[in-house]
Each structure stands twice: as C-alpha cells, then as structure tokens.
Amino acid sequence: MAADLRTRLGHIELPNPILTASGCAGSGRELAQFFDVSKIGAIVTKSVMLAPRAGRPTPRMAETPSGMLNSIGLQGPGIDAFLQRDLPWLLSRGARAVVSIAGGTVEEYAELAGRLSDAAGVTAIEVNISCPNVEDRGQVFACDPGAAAAVTEAVRGRARYDIPVFAKLSPDVTDIVSIARSCVSAGADGLSMINTLLGMSIDPDTMRPALAGLTGGLSGPAIRPIAVRCIWQVREAFPDVPIIGMGGVRTGQDAVELILAGANMVSVGTTIFHDPSACVRILRELDEELTKRGVERLADVVGLAHEPRAAARRKRAGNVL
C-alpha cells in the first residue's frame, strides 16, 4: 500500500511534498512535455520582479565537480507578463502555483504581493530575500535580521489573508536561526531553505573567472549536507513552522533525509537540468522509501531524526528510516 504523502503548505493541503525549486524550470512550461505538472505538490516559479530584467552577461553558468554555479541575475519578463501569460498557463494545467518574488526595496516586494493578491490561482508566495537592498548599500536582505523582517512584514501585510507567505533563507549567514526567527516574528507562515551558496570558479585555461559576474550561486549535491544542517537547526528552534527544504536533492532517499531533518516539503532543482522528469521520479522513489519501511504517513517522519528515543524504539521494531 502506498504511503499517505499529503502535507500542508500553511493552511493549504498538497497531495504530496515534491515541488520544483525556483529558477530551475521557469514557470513550468519547460517541464510539461516530460510530465503532468499537476501531479507534483506545486510548481515554484522563477523569481518574478516588478519590471522586466535582462539579467547578467554571459557566461552565466559553470559546472563544478559536484554541482553548478549560476549567475543569471534574476532575468525575467516582469510581473505584468507573468500575470498575463504564465499564471494563466499554470492554472490551465491544474498546477498549484507558488510564486517566487524578488525586489530591490521593501516597497517593491510589497507591491508584488499586492499584485499577486489581485490574481486568481496563487497558491502561495515564496519571498526570495537573497537580493541586494538598493537602499542600504546593497546589503542582502537575507543576511540581516532586521531587513529580512521588514520584507516579510511588508509582504504579509499586502498579501491576501488566505495566501501563505514563505520566506526563503540564505545559508550565507552565521546564524540562520536568528534570520528565521525574524521572519516568523514578522508574519511568515513558513520558511524555505536553503538558497544557493555564494561561490566562485576560475578557469585554469583562460586564467580568468568562469562567470562574467565573477561569483554565483552554488547548487547541487555539494550543498545537501548544509541544507540538512540548516533545516535541522531551524526545525529544532521552531517545531511547528512549515518548512520547504531544498538543496542537492537527486533521489527519493535524499528527500527522506531532508524530511527527517524537519522539512514538510522538498523542492527539486539542479537535477532537473539533466533529468527533466526528476520531480515525478523522486516522488515515486520517496513513496517507495517510505512504503518499504512500513511508514504509512509522511507526517509521521517529518523531523523524526529529532526524536532519538522514538527512533530507537522504531529500530528495535525493525521499522525505521
């Protein structure tokens, strides 16, 4: 018998916990030729900004031994085109849409939340706070508790009451729990983690940086242990806050690891580039991983690694992840 994979995105029930990660599949059109996008928990869109944005010069991507660096620069058509074209398409396919938003000022984030609140079909908002604050010398919102709280509060204040707001946290901080606390206190309904880590690669042949933008976001298997650590720390501090976990997930077993650390949902990103059907494959593998261990409900193993005595009892019974 298959496991019950239902989970909750704030107050909204999802049929399963597998989502796309923002930035790895546009708004889902690219994946529709490979699988039915309504079959996974939700499509998390590429971050949307108020105005169209060209992004950074090329080269924008560089492979690493265990992942990749990207320096896309939030290229996109802007909120008007998204609302006219992308969101209606997601609705027509029966997909649940978690819309990622990004901005350079607190007011830009708030305006985006207001625009989305007037639209039909927005399941939730993911707030990409890993953007430079143009009003504070380029300080990244996600790296300062006060700035992270200001953005979260502004978005929650402008978003429609029934749209959950998830703040997406950066691992490029010394204390991710303090950032999480600021966002939750400011009204976040949940948290997404982790965003990419800032990295750099130099081409030994050209003797120059591999990316035109010099630095980029590191993703892929290399960052999964960091994601597990961050999820663990935040779940330990906030037992009841919904968490979307992400970072280097390639298999159902990888997803299980994040779930045991405390993730209620798991976003799949970089692996989509070489396996466009990865989301449905990982969903199937997750079900298999749980079922073969006798786990009947996903909810029973969320954060289970925090309960060593309960886990020990399960192990003695021959039924443990």
Which residues are covered by each model-predicted region?
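N-terminal capping/small domains of soluble enzymes
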Residues: 1-97, 102-104, 282
